[in-house]
Regions:
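N-terminal glycine-/charge-rich "phosphate-binding" loop or analogous flexible N-terminal tail
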Residues: 1-43
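Rossmann-like dinucleotide-binding domain for NAD(H)/NADP(H)
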Residues: 209-364
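Rossmann-like adenosine-cofactor binding region
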Residues: 54, 156-250
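Phosphate-coordination loops involved in phosphoryl transfer and adenosine-cofactor binding
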Residues: 3, 120-123, 209
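NAD(P)-binding Rossmann-fold cofactor-contacting core
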Residues: 143-161
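Oxidoreductase and adenylate-handling cofactor-binding alpha/beta cores
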Residues: 101-117, 141-145, 276-284
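Glycine-rich adenosine-cofactor-binding loop
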Residues: 10, 93, 101, 120-141
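Phosphate/diphosphate ligand-binding glycine-rich loop within oxidoreductases
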Residues: 44-116
Length: 364
């Protein structure tokens, strides 16, 4: 069988080793994956992460017929263009759900500890009940916390929400909850677009001393509205995604309880999961079988087994800090906030490109 020519982002771990005997794999830095590069290497398949914009500029006049991203989100795909060209496209839903859930848990534990909040006084609001939202709810259900959920598309599908969550409208989430986390995709069309979903009108409903966690996509929250609210209200924020990435709002970062450069989903475990989903999509589409042995061995090496319990929250907070090093990322973010726009952008791209291996702690 003729070997398939695959161009892959070298940031997808083990993809070369798993495909080398059944395809011609060319690894490249995301910034080098260009139209001319794809043409030069006669690429038929493309495996990337969210740092590569997949559109007409990238793919016109190439032989690419398959694109897979090792990330859960795919707002870096021009879906209309791909559909018009008949190019198959795949994402990796849920691959980093536990990674992001740990970020949410860490943020809430930090808020509880620094603000001396009692668990019984928390009402948790989850906007978006996909893979991440469901997992966050399952974790906090073990702590017997009141959980409120909003996800209109799921509701329209007559989805049966678990009995440990209360469904309510978006404005009710902001009225009832003192901890809110959003996990929606960034969409600009459809019945429920999420771009600029959370504006000053909603944010003004928040109670003083609330916590807002933003780890979905930049553009879901209107940052200027959020910062203006923070000037007049006591509000804690944990922000991982930014409106103008790779640039970020320095004032907002420095005013936050936690601010990071879009790395909530960057655990090593999550990246391995993303590789697995890309390989499965390649196998199913092309009918070739990758060698999964090395990837399976690596995934088994870093399986997590720690549970979240009321009586071990301090221990969990320490373990998450030791394993995920979010405070190190926050310190680097604050330091980078002193740079000019070009410097901040370079920092943001560099840390995401060369993010160190950080291992997950929790398992539901």
């Amino acid at each position: 069988m003729k070997k398939i020519n695959i161009v892959a982002d070298f940031a997808i771990p083990f993809i070369d080793e798993c495909l080398t005997n059944i395809s011609n794999v060319v690894l490249a830095n995301h910034s080098n994956i260009t139209n001319s590069f794809l043409i030069k290497n006669n690429a038929e398949a493309l495996a990337i992460r969210s740092t590569v914009k997949v559109n007409k500029t990238l793919l016109d006049n190439t032989n690419v017929k398959f694109v897979a991203t090792a990330t859960s989100g795919y707002d870096h795909f021009d879906v209309e263009y791909l559909q018009n060209r008949g190019i198959a496209y795949f994402h990796s839903p849920g691959c980093n759900a536990n990674s992001v859930a740990e970020y949410v848990i860490y943020s809430i534990l930090k808020w509880i500890i620094t603000k001396n909040i009692e668990l019984k006084n928390i009402n948790l609001g989850i906007i978006g009940f996909g893979n991440i939202g469901k997992l966050v709810a399952r974790y906090f259900h073990t702590l017997d916390i009141n959980i409120y959920v909003n996800d209109p598309p799921l509701k329209d599908e007559n989805f049966i929400f678990p009995d440990y969550v209360h469904y309510c409208e978006l404005d009710e989430i902001f009225e009832k909850c003192n901890v809110i986390t959003n996990h929606v995709p960034l969409t600009k069309s459809g019945n429920y677009p999420t771009q600029a979903l959370i504006t000053g009108k909603l944010l003004s409903k928040l109670k003083d001393n609330s916590l807002l966690i933003h780890a979905s996509r930049g553009g879901v929250i209107v940052e200027s509205d959020l910062f203006n609210i923070m000037k007049v209200r006591k509000l804690s924020t944990a922000i991982d995604v930014w409106e103008n990435e790779p640039d970020f709002n320095s004032e907002l970062a420095n005013s936050s309880l936690l601010a990071t450069p879009h790395i909530a989903g960057y655990s090593y475990n999550g990246k391995l999961n993303g590789t697995m989903q890309v390989l499965k999509n390649i196998e199913n589409y092309f009918g070739i079988k990758p060698n999964y042995d090395i990837l399976n061995a690596e995934m088994n090496k870093y399986k997590t087994n720690t549970k979240l319990y009321i009586d071990n929250l301090q221990d969990i907070f320490k373990k998450l800090n030791d394993n995920r090093r979010f405070e190190d990322d926050f310190a680097r973010m604050r330091e980078a906030s002193k740079l000019d726009k070009a410097g901040k952008q370079a920092f943001f791209q560099e840390i995401r490109k060369n993010y160190p291996k950080r291992y997950e702690t929790l398992n539901i």
